[in-house]
């Protein structure tokens, strides 16, 4: 590809509205342009990277035995009503009507569509297992699209769906897909972790997320310092504390605290350890509990884990914090003055709360707190459950080592769905015993467009992107110095361009009339791993300058013209086929 026949579209200035490095570099490198909030046009350089990731994903899906299909992004609402996700999915589901006022959705996922297909095409257990995949555009009407393509409304995704007649068959395919995902991310040279995860709105019994480690990641992932344990923070269990509850040392007393509306203010004004404070969070109770509100208790230095709290049968789903109006109507005080003593509603306390003694909490009266509260002396122990996020240094749930917490970008998610969708939509086959049985499903997603941003978040420097070789937009850049002024430079550049291209290499030939500094800066910005610089002075010695710009190494050296092709072939093959 010649730059004079290509849309390079690089930018010198840092885009004002780009918050994270991948968004900045994708705009500056001419990979994407914003059309509207959360909607992006992919320019040629971005498209080349996207297609290379697609090819890796497609190759590994084919090796895993998945069959490629293409399903429509526009889906009839009656399928979503049948699965009951029409009511439960939320505002991210874009709903609209056609000219005949028939309701449709713009698909964020395709469980309903594939289940409808399979229930009409598959009738016997003998036709199972089957695993279908597609690489297709999705749409989620995000309330606040941000970070460029990282959280866009329209995005490219690989989604796969498997169908089985036994749990053993599902587990076998699940493991095959787990290994395929691992291979995909290894081929892309990403530093990632596969972590246990919550099934969320997709549903099912078991799931794993594949998280690319990056400081800009929106997710927190937890892993052991010793073992292979790894989980999303939403799922990581906070174990029952080893220590026993200490005996009371303080008397119960109530103190005026007019300027202590938060835990931090209470700690600062009364010089008490934050571990001796209690947060009382009021949420709406499940409609079958007989109560409107209930209280969740966590230690002052801990954060409530909404996913864990939602699993309590007494909590309304989704978990919703009570309005200040409802809190005041039921308790007589507002947030900042709440506590468990004399609270007339169900109470659920975190495990760490159960071993607290001589602690402080709101009195349920404005601007007053109790100090010296003790369980069983001043109030009975409530229901005890795991309600909090783990913190670094907590013991690992598998009993091996302690926990570290890193930020991650979710790029893949696999689920064992079970019969959630087949049950709702009547997807049955005739079993070995001759009776009808529900098909058992698995679901496997990869954010293809998000992978582009995730790779940049991990691999960049002050000059631009450092692409892993397998997904670089071009493998080789040819930079002739003063192309229009030197016949020798032009002839050698043309010869090398033709020869390298004939060998199947992705080559960009910068034939613009630009200063060398501009050419160097553009190639570094868009992240070309191998650069050949051809100038008159080097040609006099039958040489050229070679620069390597990889994710783990940068170097430059002189090469004999006669050695260039064999040198590049060896370098590129070594990166694609590491020992």
Curated annotation (Swiss-Prot):
EC class name: ligase
GO molecular-function terms, A-Z: aminoacyl-tRNA deacylase activity; ATP binding; proline-tRNA ligase activity
Recorded superkingdom: Bacteria
GO biological process: prolyl-tRNA aminoacylation
Catalytic activity: tRNA(Pro) + L-proline + ATP = L-prolyl-tRNA(Pro) + AMP + diphosphate
SUPFAM superfamilies: Class II aaRS ABD-related, Class II aaRS and biotin synthetases, YbaK/ProRS associated domain
Any one GO cellular component localisation term in the record: cytosol
Entry keyword Translocase: no
Compartments where found: Cytoplasm
Major localisation: cytoplasm
UniProt keyword list: Aminoacyl-tRNA synthetase, ATP-binding, Cytoplasm, Ligase, Nucleotide-binding, Protein biosynthesis
Catalytic activity, EC: 6.1.1.15
Keyword Secreted: no
Record comment regarding domains: Consists of three domains: the N-terminal catalytic domain, the editing domain and the C-terminal anticodon-binding domain.
Subunit annotation: Homodimer.
NCBIfam families: PRK09194.1, proS_fam_II
Function text: Catalyzes the attachment of proline to tRNA(Pro) in a two-step reaction: proline is first activated by ATP to form Pro-AMP and then transferred to the acceptor end of tRNA(Pro). As ProRS can inadvertently accommodate and process non-cognate amino acids such as alanine and cysteine, to avoid such errors it has two additional distinct editing activities against alanine. One activity is designated as 'pretransfer' editing and involves the tRNA(Pro)-independent hydrolysis of activated Ala-AMP.
The protein, known as: Proline--tRNA ligase
């Amino acid at each position: 590809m010649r730059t004079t026949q290509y849309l390079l579209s690089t930018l010198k200035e840092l885009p004002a509205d780009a918050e994270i490095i991948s968004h900045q570099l994708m705009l500056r490198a001419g990979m994407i342009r914003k059309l509207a909030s959360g909607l992006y046009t992919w320019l040629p350089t971005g498209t080349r990277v996207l297609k290379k990731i697609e090819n890796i994903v497609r190759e590994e899906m084919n090796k895993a035995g998945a069959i490629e299909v293409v399903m429509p992004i526009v889906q009839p609402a009656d399928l979503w009503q049948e699965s009951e996700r029409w009511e439960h999915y939320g505002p991210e589901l874009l709903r609209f009507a056609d000219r005949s006022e028939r309701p449709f959705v713009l698909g964020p996922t395709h469980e309903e569509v594939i289940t409808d297909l399979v229930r009409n095409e598959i009738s016997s257990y003998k036709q199972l297992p089957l695993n279908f995949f597609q690489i297709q555009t999705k749409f989620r009407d995000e309330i606040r699209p941000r970070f460029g393509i990282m959280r866009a409304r329209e995005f490219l995704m690989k989604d796969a769906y498997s169908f089985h007649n036994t749990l053993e068959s599902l587990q076998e395919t699940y493991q095959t897909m787990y290994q395929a995902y691992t291979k995909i991310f290894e081929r892309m040279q990403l530093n990632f972790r596969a972590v246990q995860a919550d099934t969320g709105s997709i549903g099912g019994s078991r799931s794993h997320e594949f998280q690319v480690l990056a400081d800009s990641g929106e997710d927190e992932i937890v892993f052991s310092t010793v073992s292979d344990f790894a989980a999303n923070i939403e799922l990581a269990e906070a174990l029952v504390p080893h220590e026993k509850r200490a005996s009371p040392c303080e008397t119960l007393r109530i103190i005026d605290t007019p300027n202590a509306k938060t835990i931090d203010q209470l700690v600062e004004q009364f010089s008490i350890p934050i571990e001796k404070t209690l947060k009382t969070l009021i949420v709406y109770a499940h409609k079958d509990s007989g109560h409107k509100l209930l209280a969740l208790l966590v230690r002052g230095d801990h954060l409530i884990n909404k996913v864990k709290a939602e699993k309590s049968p007494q909590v309304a789903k989704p978990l919703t914090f009570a309005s200040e109006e409802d809190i005041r109507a039921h308790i007589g005080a507002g947030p900042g003055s709440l506590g468990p003593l004399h609270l007339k509603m169900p109470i659920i306390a975190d495990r760490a709360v159960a071993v607290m003694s001589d602690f402080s909490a709101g009195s349920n009266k404005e601007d007053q707190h109790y100090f010296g509260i003790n369980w069983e002396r001043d109030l009975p122990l409530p229901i005890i459950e795991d309600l909090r996020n783990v913190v670094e240094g907590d013991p690992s749930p598998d009993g091996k080592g302690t926990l570290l917490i890193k930020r991650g970008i979710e790029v893949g998610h696999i689920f064992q769905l079970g019969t959630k969708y087949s049950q709702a939509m009547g997807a049955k086959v005739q079993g070995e015993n001759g009776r009808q049985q529900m098909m058992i499903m698995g679901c496997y997603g990869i954010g293809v467009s998000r992978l582009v941003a995730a790779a940049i978040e991990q691999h960049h420097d002050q000059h631009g992107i450092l692409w892993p070789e397998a997904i670089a937009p071009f493998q080789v850049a040819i930079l002739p110095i003063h192309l229009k002024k030197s016949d020798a430079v032009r002839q050698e550049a043309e010869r090398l361009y033709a020869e390298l291209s004939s060998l199947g290499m992705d080559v960009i030939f910068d034939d613009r009339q630009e200063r060398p500094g501009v050419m160097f800066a553009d190639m570094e910005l868009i992240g070309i791993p191998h650069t050949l610089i051809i100038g008159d002075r080097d040609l006099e010695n039958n040489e050229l300058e070679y620069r390597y710009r990889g994710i783990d190494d940068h170097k430059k050296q002189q090469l004999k013209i006669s050695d260039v092709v064999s040198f590049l072939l060896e370098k590129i093959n070594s990166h694609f086929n590491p020992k």
